[in-house]
């Protein structure tokens, strides 16, 4: 990591100085930033900003000032309040982190810089294509990727190995959805407990259906085609058998209590996975948690959801915009970007960062869970295609209704199955038809 830091510093010193030949102003040009990385006091990004300010910032008379560190939801609301000139709203900063939904909700998207005006085609081509494309809105590069996460499979190896010794379960079974759900059904039969929890049922279907070569969306709704039925069958079978966690909340909780063995969740949730399981009887044990690439369908493409905010720059003056770009080019330079993301558990955003700097950085990591996560990142980036959702105004509504209704229908189906009088096969399709009827298209 020290070597990467030295490379990062050299990049800072080699960046071109703006206004060459002109007299430097006494006061630095200060540009402001709202971000989500850490807290006000303990933030890896704030530490890097301090380094920038004392090196290339000092050379070019630029100072980056962090005005707000919060969560993405709060920043979304604050940006829209400022853009709409709501009473009491703060002024927009020069830079803020954003999902596409924030840009789409702006009253005027033209208030944002188009990064194509400041980055050459070659510079933009250095980014992972899907990461860059997600930030292309209305034909403009409105969002610049900084960090990314994805969805990975977390497994409690201690519990899995204990059960596998008796059942014959294998880690290869965890590489496909068919295998995961078959294990979930078997585990429920053997132990009476859940095996698998997915944080994002909507994403399982969305990415899964697309990986099978079929469109998941149709117009402003969901297309319930043969691919959807293909994804529903093993999912519902495991749910009806009791092997799929159907409660609300995040996947970290049932793994923390031993109520599930395997989860699929955002890789960023690595922060919340514990190496101690506390059981309902208040006993506890140390466990080993590791990660693997997200499962795929046996006959499907290797497709996986990408996640994470990027950075928007607000139009102002050429000087202020150039100052922001100088900072962002530094932060996304491969060596610096790897130093940044590995302090947080995220993925870098350029191919060179993955190929040249990330493997070396992984060798320096000491936490086995993070070593496993970054090995999973490297495998995922090499073998998978990153998927990002379409830009739909009603996307969040479709997602929230889907998550609630899918769990509700399978929970009701599970009750019917336990009461008897219904076969599992019949309930698989009855729950699907009921779900489609209530959800709509």
What kind of region is each of these model predictions?
Residues 97-152, 181, 286-295:
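Hinge/lid segment of periplasmic solute-binding proteins
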Residues 237, 241-243, 280-352:
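Extracytoplasmic/periplasmic substrate-recognition and gating elements
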Residues 138-146, 151-153, 178-227, 260-262:
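Extracytoplasmic/periplasmic solute-binding protein
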Residues 363-364, 371, 375-441:
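Conserved C-terminal helix/tail region of periplasmic/extracytoplasmic solute-binding proteins
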Residues 58-127, 162-163, 261-262, 280-283:
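Extracytoplasmic "Venus flytrap"/periplasmic binding protein-like
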Residues 181-186, 218-249, 290-294:
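Glycine-centered hinge/linker elements that transmit conformational signals in sensory
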Residues 116-127, 172, 214-231, 237, ...:
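Short, solvent-exposed loop/beta-turn-alpha elements that line the ligand-binding surface or hinge
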Residues 27-39, 61-68, 94-95, 142:
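Short, well-ordered beta-strand elements
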